[in-house]
């Protein structure tokens, strides 16, 4: 049976919500979305728990007349709910984080393929399911966080190098039940095959500074405290600490640096937050319009500014904190591979002793 990690969400607070609301209310009136108003309602099942997302949805209603009802829960609970509701489900759209979960939803038969010229032109091919079952809405990069007093960034290079004995008892990461680590392993499986990926996983486990525990923020804190020297985490977890109004969070962030792996070859591992139209959606056309709206320039900017994510749409600015991380090269592996390789990735992680 697959092990499924529990996603820990951090709210962005009133200031970010106000920022999003202000900017979205001032979107260009010439938007094609604003020129259409057919009314109706769409029901969105979402595993993203951010107040700023609600501001996005409210603005969609203002522009189109389509009301958005939100059901929030953990991704796997939402997938199971849609499955149990069957043909009677009121769900039109499923939004979740990680391509691995979107693949699970697709495999469960609860998403339908759609054709959208807007989505196909905006969302890069490697960040959407080839048949149109789901599309990336934002990008999340799996980076290396290093303790500045213990590691020179010149010592860092690739994900593969984390299995090098030179990092013995220095690596911090989440458990194998975490979907982000499962997808990272799944991408390595696609690149290197099972044998080399298992060798990597075994070497990585031998280098753990402690048994895996906590979320990505916990890994960064432990890295800053010297429990280990290098942590594997999604980039926005560090951005949140930098932006925190708590002095202790900013102090943690000041002790660590961020490194994009594999910049001399294929690029860093890029995952997504994404969405798909539910099979049998009562308002299919409204659901498609909603997804197209979420990749519009201003909506993409708000994703970036509110939660420190990278947009999927080219030319959209990132948050100033994220901009300070510098430019990076992202791998071109199709995100659908993460889910397709999930079961084998879990078996490899288990055999390697990654708990």
Curated annotation (Swiss-Prot):
Coiled coil: none
InterPro entries listed in its UniProt record: Ferric-bd
Chain residues that bind Fe cation: 49-50, 180, 236-237
Membrane topology: Peripheral membrane protein
Keywords: Ion transport, Iron, Iron transport, Membrane, Metal-binding, Signal, Thylakoid, Transport
Pfam families: SBP_bac_6
GO biological process: iron ion transport
Induction, as annotated: By iron limitation and to a smaller extent by manganese limitation.
GO MF annotation terms: metal ion binding
Protein name: Iron deficiency-induced protein A
Posttranslational mods: Predicted to be exported by the Tat system. The position of the signal peptide cleavage has not been experimentally proven.
Stated role: Plays an important role in protecting the acceptor side of photosystem II (PSII) against oxidative damage, especially under iron-limiting growth conditions. May also be part of a periplasmic ABC transporter complex involved in iron import.
Recorded family membership: Belongs to the bacterial solute-binding protein 1 family.
Annotated Gene Ontology cellular component terms: outer membrane-bounded periplasmic space; plasma membrane-derived thylakoid membrane
Aminoacyl-tRNA synthetase among keywords: no
Signal peptide: 1-34
Organism superkingdom: Bacteria
